[in-house]
Amino acid sequence: LTFGGHGRTAVTFEPTYAMYGQIARTTQCRVVEAGRDDDFRITEPVLEAVIESERPDLLFVCSPNNPTGTPESREVVDLAISKSQGVVVVDEAYGQFADFTAIEMLKQSEAPESLVVTRTFSKTWSMAGVRLGYCVAPPWMLPEFEKVVLPYHLDSLKQIAGRIALRFHDEMEERVTQISAERQRIATALSGLGLKVFPSQAN
């Protein structure tokens, strides 16, 4: 809502989380759907080409991707930031399962001014029904978000639930480790049956 709107362009890489395109279109933003390779990764040639041809105001990178679980590399995120003149949104709903997180880039002394990282309590915290999430972004973006945020977008119960959940961070990390190990066990077993298993760093 903040960076979309009439006369602007958003880029997604399909297949991916459908709400990026749907919400962008409700603001009359033009949505361009780029593709992925056979392993559902975003390739650097496709990324560069779509940025060059479309000049997007918004570029969405879901990592690990929903619904494929495919992680993107730091190199892909770096390339998106360096080539794009618009805002790069990295959706890390499954970020705690991944080896790389774009949040680390925002901790640098020279953090990217166009990068937004979004996360949710729905996955690793098992709080999907609460509908609670957050973003990590450069300070200049926060007043822009405030311009479009609903006045009652986050009730007190959600805030309390989120604060209580954070007390159990160690337990969450332990659960992530267990789920990741089970994911690998199942992937190995399926590969042993002769099935192709796509690389995943989701749950």
Describe the function of each predicted region:
Residues V11, L58-C62, V89, Y134-V136:
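Structural motif
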Residues E14, E33-D38, E92:
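Short beta->alpha connector loops at strand-helix junctions that form conserved
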Residues R25, I42-E54, P67-T124:
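Active-site pre-lysine segment of PLP-dependent enzymes
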Residues M19-G21, S114-S191, L195-F198:
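PLP-dependent aminotransferase class I/II
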Residues L1-T9:
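Phosphate-binding glycine-rich loop
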Residues P199-N203:
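Conserved PLP cofactor-binding pocket of PLP-dependent enzymes
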